[in-house]
């Protein structure tokens, strides 16, 4: 088993005093196991696990799939009540505590390793904005007690390299005592290898709907919300607002088989499954919230949608029609401007650029108008600042963002929780990759939830917007239904 880096190299890095930890790694062939099988093994030894994978817009599978289990620490906060493992504190600024924890895990980046080598995995809720924007906080009831932020710190990573058909095992070591830490990391790598090769797989990871799926807002209630929103638009209060509806049903068991189905019927750039202390999430999101890599920020606004054509010719005609739709283009341009404004809050002056405008992004069932906005993060800011600057995305709130969020709180009168928030990771190296929490199913308190929204403008038809919410929820609902018939 070849270990990288060598002990000599580790000692040299430790002498610099720049870092607290370092990723030690080895490689094994992956032809004996799949990521799904690996997750079954991890679930058998820990209730706290995650799986992150990707399918690209060109229908190719993403290069890396990341898995982890048994976190070193769980961090969450709800209404200012924060838990850091066993420690409880009251705070108006959870990000400062998260930042303090990350500051104890500074790590070098090695080019031979994948983008994620350990760090925080989980979600920041849509409502996390309330800690920074006090006018939004407390405007909505929370009947399910969803955390405002829920993150787990993983110092061991299993990375499937789908291109090279190998698994990269990573164990982060402390640089306080390099030789002791190095030897401990090697033991952990051997344990990881043994677990994957001989671990027992957990059975019965399916779930069961125990009753009818019911909406938070019936049709009449939702249409009334739309009319109220249109009044605010006509008064010049806002330009656009995204109003959501939540479907729920009694549920028992796991969402893992739901995830297995979702990744086949709706392959997406961001596919994820994780289970924590009191919540389980399965999702396939098409849209990046914000990404930070080596000091460069990206956000990729998606707005404007058409179904995929049955033939290449029909697909091309649908693309041409979408790019000529003035209403779709106007909405998209507004979101591009919002993305530029959001990145500008934490980027170096003059660095924010629209790299790509009005490209067509094709996915399994739909195509979207996509653009790319880039910025270079200022030295005084970090991944947490970038998330706070962008969250929630304009596609989940509206414009102007703050006023739209205030009205969402008043009209929906129900905290959104995970939906519309950020799901992903913050790496020990300072890099970060998060998606918008849409196309998800999540479970808590014996119930499963699916939430979706529609963008409301001045001439919106309330009944059509209600139906759009239902249509957007179909992939997650179908996955829930089909997963009940999945065989082990």
Regions found by a protein language model. Give the residues of each.
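Extended alpha-helical targeting/anchoring segments
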Residues: 1-488
């Amino acid at each position: 088993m070849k270990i990288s880096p060598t002990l000599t190299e580790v000692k040299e890095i430790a002498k610099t005093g720049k870092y607290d930890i370092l990723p030690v790694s080895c490689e094994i062939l992956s032809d004996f196991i799949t990521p799904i099988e690996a997750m079954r093994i991890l679930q058998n030894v820990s209730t706290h696990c995650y799986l992150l994978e990707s399918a690209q817009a060109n229908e190719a599978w993403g290069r890396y799939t990341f898995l982890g289990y048994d976190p070193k620490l769980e961090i969450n906060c709800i209404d200012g009540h924060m838990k850091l493992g066993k420690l409880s504190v009251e705070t108006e600024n959870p990000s400062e505590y998260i930042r303090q924890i990350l500051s104890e895990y500074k790590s070098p980046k090695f080019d031979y390793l994948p983008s994620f080598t350990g760090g925080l995995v989980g979600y920041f809720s849509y409502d996390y904005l309330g800690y920074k924007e006090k006018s939004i906080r407390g405007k909505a009831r929370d009947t399910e007690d969803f955390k405002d932020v829920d993150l787990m710190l993983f110092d061991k990573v299993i990375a499937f390299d789908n291109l090279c058909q190998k698994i990269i095992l990573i164990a982060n070591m402390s640089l306080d005592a390099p030789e002791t830490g190095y030897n401990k990391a090697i033991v952990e790598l051997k344990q990881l290898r043994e677990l994957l090769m001989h671990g027992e797989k957990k059975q019965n990871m399916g779930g069961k709907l125990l009753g009818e799926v019911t909406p938070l807002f019936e049709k009449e209630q939702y249409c009334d919300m739309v009319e109220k929103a249109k009044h605010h638009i006509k008064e010049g209060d806002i330009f656009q607002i995204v109003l959501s509806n939540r479907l729920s049903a009694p549920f028992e068991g796991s969402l893992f088989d739901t995830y297995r189905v979702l990744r086949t019927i709706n392959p997406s750039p961001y596919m994820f499954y994780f289970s924590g202390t009191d919540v389980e999430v399965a999702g396939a999101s098409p849209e990046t919230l914000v990404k930070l890599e080596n000091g460069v920020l990206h956000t990729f606004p998606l707005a404007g949608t058409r179904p995929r054509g049955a033939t290449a010719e029909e697909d091309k005609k649908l693309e041409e029609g979408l790019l000529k739709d003035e209403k779709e283009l106007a909405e998209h341009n507004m979101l591009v401007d919002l993305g530029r404004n959001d990145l500008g809050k934490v980027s170096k002056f003059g660095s924010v650029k629209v790299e790509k405008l009005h490209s067509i992004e094709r996915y399994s069932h739909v195509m979207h108008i996509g653009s790319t906005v880039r910025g270079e993060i200022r030295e005084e800011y970090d991944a947490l600042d970038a998330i706070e600057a962008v969250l929630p995305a304009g596609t989940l709130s509206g414009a102007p963002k703050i006023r739209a969020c205030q009205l969402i709180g008043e009209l929906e009168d129900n905290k959104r929780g995970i939906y519309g928030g950020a799901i992903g990771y913050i790496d020990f190296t300072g890099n970060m990759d998060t998606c918008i929490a849409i196309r998800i199913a999540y479970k808590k308190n014996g119930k499963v939830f699916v939430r979706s929204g529609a963008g409301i403008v001045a001439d919106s038809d309330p009944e059509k917007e209600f139906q759009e919410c239902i249509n957007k929820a179909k992939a997650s609902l179908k996955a829930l239904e089909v997963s009940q018939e999945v065989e082990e």
